[in-house]
């Protein structure tokens, strides 16, 4: 998992509430357990004019140009703005996989579904909670936003906002540690335990 550093990006304003995981990545694309390759089907039913299936050549599919992800001014955006209860529905981890594979590094919303919120951290995405009044301000922005995880701050052209985050989750994002990476930090301790254990119980 890549280390999360301070970055600046435009933000995509997807002004919808209660976006569930099936809207984020439809169920027909969940057959793979690899983390990569889901970005092209992110928000598939809104992004394309036809019905998507596994194996289709997405470059030849008709785009819905009214959908924000397809608009030229938002290409390359790393920040997603949404309304409340983002990531509700089934607890598929493919949803943050698709968001991360598309290129999103942070999602800002008034609230998130609990399991989705936890899965974001495990996949290197920073979910930021801001109240509705602040979200109203963000949705009117036309410039770039800078996110500084170390300072827990969001900077626009005119204002600075702050957000809360669990200190351990913050540490893991800053250091690029997923569950496996966190475990590997204790490799020497694990080897020492295994050696001691098998010396004591060598008949096992």
Swiss-Prot record:
Sequence similarity: Belongs to the LeuD family. LeuD type 1 subfamily.
One GO BP annotation of this record: L-leucine biosynthetic process
Subunit comment: Heterodimer of LeuC and LeuD.
Intrachain S-S bonds: none
GO molecular function: 3-isopropylmalate dehydratase activity
Gene (UniProt): leuD
Keyword Membrane: no
Protein name per the record: 3-isopropylmalate dehydratase small subunit
UniProt-listed Enzyme Commission number(s): 4.2.1.33
Pathway linked to the protein: Amino-acid biosynthesis; L-leucine biosynthesis; L-leucine from 3-methyl-2-oxobutanoate: step 2/4
PANTHER family: 3-ISOPROPYLMALATE DEHYDRATASE SMALL SUBUNIT, 3-ISOPROPYLMALATE DEHYDRATASE SMALL SUBUNIT 2-RELATED-RELATED
Residue ranges of coiled coil: none
UniProt GO cellular component terms: 3-isopropylmalate dehydratase complex
Function statement: Catalyzes the isomerization between 2-isopropylmalate and 3-isopropylmalate, via the formation of 2-isopropylmaleate.
